[in-house]
Every structure is written in C-alpha cells, then in structure tokens.
Amino acid sequence: MQLSVVFFISRPLLILSLPVNFLRQYIWNHRTKFALNILAHPWLTLITFNGLLTIYLIPAVFNIIHTNIFLSIITQAILFVSAIFMWWVIIHPVPEIKGLDYLLRALYIFLASLALFPIGFYYVIIQSAHFPVYIPVERELIHSLSSIYDQQLAGGILKVMQLASYSFVLLILLFKWGKQEEAKEGSVDEEHIRYARGVVIHLDKEKK
C-alpha cells in the first residue's frame, strides 16, 4: 500500500505542486538540460523505472535490500529519482520543453501499465511466504490476514493503484488533447496546413 501511494500518487502530485517557473529555473536550465535530456528520455525512463521496481519487488532481492539500512536508503533514492523522471514524461510540466505529443504519451501510459503486470500477477498467485521480516507480525492488525494473504493483497493493491493513477492521468490527457484539436479547428499554421473537423488539409502557399 505504501509503495503504491509513494510511486503512483505522491510522485505526480509532487511534480504538479512545483511552480513552472521553479522548474524552469532550478530543474531544467542550461546547466542541467543536457544531462536531463538523457536521464529523462521517454523510453529510457519507462524501462528504467519499471525494470528497477520489478527487480526490487522480487522477494530474494527485496529481502537482501532490507537487511541493510544503507542499501535500503540508496535503493529508495534511486527509485525516487527514476519515478520522478517517468512521471515527468507523462505530465510534461514545462510546456516549451519538447516532449511526447498526446498520442505518444497515451501509448507511454499504456505500456507503463503493462510493465508491472508480471510481478503484480506473481504476488497475486503466490502460495508461500517469501518475506521473513513480516512473518513475525502477521495477523496483528487483521487476524485473518496471514502473510500469504498479505502478499497477495499487496500485489492486487499495486496493480489497482497503478491502473487507477494511470487511468486518471490518461483521461486528463485525452481531455487536453481534445481541447487542443478544438482550438486548431479552422486554423492555418505556418506550414500551410488547415484543420477542419479533425481533417488535415494541405494548402498551396499561394492560396494561403
């Protein structure tokens, strides 16, 4: 539950809470632009965040990480940064920075929603306890919730929270996309293209 909230609710809200001028001045400026263009590359962030989170959630890896506080802190920091970059691509908070168009962002969200399906499905069908650290405290909060059921519930919550956050953002993107296309209706751009009822019409320059 905590992990789902951290990566699929608090991260996008953190980006949205920052003023655009702050992002321009301190996050995306001439000193950081080159590095961020690489680190925040859309398809790299898609693979990096979902790949790292999947590896982190593998029981053997998870147990090793949480036996060392410093390793746990480093892992959380890496996941934090990779989640920020992934949500940056989706939200695109600074309009003048070149990013994916609405169609590609919708595709990006669709692929991101599929990326964690294997590990989420694994937790749902799991039939043995894989996290020794949680076994001593099983049934303390809810008596009928064994460590196995707890793992299965965690997998279900992970997918539900992920899909809910992505679906909400996708609806907002589709709404903005529709408003953008509506604003283009009947206009002619610098490439002599007219937009009429969603149809693109190429005009001769002399007929502009």
What are the residue ranges of the model-derived segments?
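Alpha-helical membrane segments of multi-pass proteins
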Residues: 1-208
